[in-house]
Amino acid sequence: MFVNRRYTARGKNLPSSPKKVRPIADNIRGKPYSEAVAILCSMPNKCAKLLGKVVKSAASNAMYHNRNLSEDMIFIKTVMVDDGRRRRSVWPRARGRADRLVNRSCHIFVEVYEKMYGGE
């Protein structure tokens, strides 16, 4: 029998816009955990570091719930990046005008699964 158990982790209100995180999330979707971490560590972006923390948290959750699980058995199943809260502020401009400054954040959802063969 083929056993697939799934484990999740979420990062909420992370200080980076979803537009910047989504291309990085596309690079690791469907990959083994060790390969995904290697890809994220080699990227110089701040977003890669944030995404790496959530991926490591999901893998840690998987290894906590199943002590016999090794890193080689963990695969990335789902990576979703959604809009988080927006912090709006005012940016003073010339001649008494003002522009609106919007600082975006994102929610990252990572789901990993274990690939292993088990008995009944």
Swiss-Prot record:
The keyword Mitochondrion does not apply. GO terms for cellular component: cytosolic large ribosomal subunit. CDD domains: Ribosomal_L22. Residues 1-20 are annotated as: Disordered. InterPro entries: Ribosomal_uL22, Ribosomal_uL22_bac/chlpt-type, Ribosomal_uL22_bac/org-type, Ribosomal_uL22_CS, Ribosomal_uL22_sf. One of its GO terms (biological process) is translation. HAMAP family: Ribosomal_uL22_B (MF_01331_B). Belongs to the universal ribosomal protein uL22 family. This is Large ribosomal subunit protein uL22.
